[in-house]
Amino acid sequence: YFARRAFGPGNAIARSIAHVSSNLDAPVSIDDLAARAHMSRAAFHRKFKQATTMSPIQFVKSMRLNTAAMKIAGGFTVNEAAMDVGYLSTSQFSREFKRMYGQSPRQWGAAHHLPSGVA
């Protein structure tokens, strides 16, 4: 939805964002995203960064961590949330989560717990 509003439905970057958001649990490669957008890797990276202010990998990581944060707030365990958004290692997920949010996933979940059915 965000991507369509920001870039229009036919935009290659918008399609890439939609693909990533629909497949957060799957491995993502820049080469695959560039091929889907019919661009070279360098052109895709440049256009993606112009459109989002983040590199494609930073954007994917941010989407995954944001989605996981909402799942944790909604009652998922840290492990469930990490696996659900494509992390194979809970420790790597926890390190990256803490880097982005300034606290561990457990601390964040305790401080941001949502009533059941909201997330």
Q: Where in the sequence are the language-model features?
A:
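Basic/polar phosphate-binding segments, predominantly the helix-turn-helix DNA-binding elements
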Residues: F2-A3, P9, H19-S21, P27-M63, ...
